[in-house]
UniProtKB/Swiss-Prot annotation:
It is a multi-pass membrane protein. Changing residue 138 to L: Found in patients with bipolar disorder; decreases the vesicular uptake of noradrenaline, dopamine and serotonin. The chain crosses the membrane at residues 22-42, 139-158, 168-188, 198-218, 228-250, 257-279, 300-319, 336-360, 366-386, 398-418, 423-443, 449-470. Expressed primarily in neuroendocrine tissues. Highly expressed in chromaffin cells of the adrenal medulla (at protein level). Detected in peripheral sympathetic ganglia (at protein level). Found in some paracrine cells in stomach and duodenum (at protein level). Expressed in substantia nigra. The lineage of its organism: Eukaryota, Metazoa, Chordata, Craniata, Vertebrata. It is found in: Cytoplasmic vesicle, Secretory vesicle membrane; Cytoplasmic vesicle, Secretory vesicle, Synaptic vesicle membrane. Residues 43-138, 189-197, 251-256, 320-335, 387-397, 444-448 are lumenal, vesicle. This is Chromaffin granule amine transporter. It comes from Homo sapiens (Human). One of its GO terms (molecular function) is monoamine transmembrane transporter activity. One of its GO terms (cellular component) is presynapse. InterPro entries: MFS, MFS_dom, MFS_trans_sf, MFS_Vesicular_Transporter, Multidrug-R. Pfam families: MFS_1.
């Protein structure tokens, strides 16, 4: 009896390691924490940099003038200082107690219009709109740094998982993510925030590629894989859902470090779960040699699916650095609203990934993705029409639902394309999927700020929306991608219903290939 009791934990642990559902839980939690950290900084960084740098520059300037000459305070003249954070000259009106600053690219002292200052005070807007316009580029680069680093690391993580399995890279991702979260909590400068964001990109690459590849390997049936991917992407959606509102509220009422310390604690729990379930010290390479990464990149069907993921997610990625600052300038929104603006998109994304994870397989994943990209484009065109936070609810909700349609359709398609046309080893193909996702989050924020400065926020939305609408018809090519003959033969035996929509022009009843049809593949190729 005593031995049975002592052996019970070990028996439960052994059963847990053999359970596909617990593997799904591990991946769900990893994606949840990754994307909570990904979005929790969205409302914090713009206002944090404003509080730290803009006000610091102006307060130090006024202290200097107060100590040097009493006559300077009474004078309504304007003086200039050199800003240490973006190499620009700042013109400051000395007679205004709050120190309103305007950014100029020259050393000349051009007086700002008095009406702007009066309007800012009446509407409780943040002062220094010029600073916000300059800051939008730096905020965009900071947000994009995570995706850029993930973009660089992914091509190495995919083949690595093929060699050593998914468990060790998954745990390595947790360790790096934990260090990044702690660094965010105690970073007080732009440089440290940039390093923490870059470190997060490395950890996210390990977690995302290994997690999705692991799911594809344990859920071999296409219907089950679609449901599992939808559930896992639900963790991603929940992270996006909770992250921005959680960050804005905690930053407003508790402080900058609080949300990151809470995430660090949750990451520790995830690490303990991985230690129990995944055995991260065990090297378990794939039994079959995977298709080389560059060979997968030559597959036009994989490229079409990757492009769909990239452009759809670019829609929300380009909003992250630009929408909060646009709201600060045009709506005079308080800090807590900057994160809540993304709440409709996150809720609808959570609904979309879970709903269309099942429906997409019935209606056709290519059609689901095509409709999703059209809705993404239309929603982005409607964003600039909003005059307050309530006007953003409809466009953002449509955007989130549509991206959920695209992601829940394209992620299973990537795995199924490998099953049909290549070797069923999934590390490299999900590295490509993650690269596509990261390209959207790298190109969007890094170029969004520059485009806003050049032609304005509304035109940025028009450009991104039109790109999605124009790309959408390409999803039609995923309707019936041809399979390699030998792959189709295997799939026809195992699950004939799965391959019906993917059959080539040749009737499937002639497969599997017999001796009489040896010449046919050469003819088909």
């Amino acid at each position: 009896m005593l031995r049975t009791i002592l052996d019970a934990p070990q028996r439960l642990l052994k059963e847990g390691r053999a359970s596909r559902q617990l593997v799904l839980v591990v991946v769900f939690v990893a994606l949840l924490l990754d994307n909570m950290l990904f979005t929790v900084v969205v409302p914090i960084v713009p206002t944090f940099l404003y509080d730290m740098e803009f006000k610091e520059v102006n307060s130090s300037l006024h202290l200097g003038h107060a100590g040097s000459s009493p006559h300077a305070l009474a004078s309504p003249a304007f003086s200039t200082i050199f800003s240490f954070f973006n190499n620009n000259t700042v013109a400051v009106e000395e007679s205004v107690p709050s120190g309103i600053a305007w950014m100029n690219d020259t050393a000349s002292t051009i007086p700002p219009p008095a009406t702007e200052a009066i309007s800012a005070h009446k509407n409780n807007c943040l002062q220094g709109t010029g600073f916000l316009e300059e800051e939008i580029t730096r905020v965009g680069v900071l947000f994009a740094s995570k995706a850029v680093m993930q973009l660089l690391v992914n091509p190495f993580v995919g083949p690595l998982t093929n060699r050593i399995g998914y468990h060790i890279p998954m745990f390595a991702g947790f360790v790096i993510m934990f260090l990044s979260t702690v660094m965010f909590a105690f970073s007080g400068t732009y440089t440290l925030l940039f390093v923490a964001r870059t470190l997060q990109g490395i950890g996210s690459s390990f977690s995302s590629v290994a997690g999705l590849g692991m799911l594809a390997s344990v859920y071999t049936d296409d219907h089950e894989r679609g449901r599992a991917m939808g559930t896992a992407l639900g963790g991603l959606a929940l992270g996006l859902l909770v992250g921005a509102p959680f960050g804005s509220v905690m930053y407003e009422f508790v402080g900058k470090s609080a949300p990151f310390l809470i995430l660090a604690f949750l990451a520790l729990l995830d690490g303990a779960l991985q230690l129990c379930i995944l055995q991260p010290s065990k090297v378990s390479p794939e039994s079959a040699k995977g298709t080389p990464l560059f060979m997968l990149l030559k597959d036009p069907y994989i490229l079409v699916a990757a492009g769909s993921i990239c452009f759809a997610n670019m829609g929300v990625a380009i909003l992250e650095p630009t929408l909060p600052i646009w709201m600060m300038q045009t709506m005079c929104s308080p800090k807590w609203q900057l994160g809540l603006a993304f709440l409709p998109a996150s809720v609808s994304y959570l609904i979309g990934t879970n709903l269309f994870g099942v429906l997409a397989n019935k209606m056709g994943r290519w059609l689901c993705s095509l409709i999703g990209m059209l809705v993404v484009g239309t929603s982005l065109l409607c964003v600039p029409l909003a005059h307050n936070i309530f006007g953003l609810i409809g466009p953002n909700a449509g955007l989130g639902l549509a991206i959920g349609m695209v992601d829940s359709s394209m992620m299973p398609i990537m795995g199924h394309l490998v099953d049909l046309r290549h070797t069923s080893v999934y590390g490299s193909v999900y590295a490509i999927a993650d690269v596509a996702f990261c390209m959207g989050f790298a190109i969007g924020p890094s170029t969004g700020g520059a485009i806003v400065k050049a032609i304005g926020f509304p035109w940025l939305m028009v450009i991104t929306g039109v790109i999605n609408i124009v790309y959408a018809p390409l999803c039609y090519y995923l309707r019936s991608p041809p399979a390699k003959e030998e792959k189709l033969a295997i799939l026809s035996q195992d699950c004939p219903m799965e391959t019906r929509m993917y059959a080539t022009q040749k009737p499937t009843k002639e497969f599997p290939l017999g001796e009489d049809s040896d010449e046919e593949p050469d003819h088909e190729e």
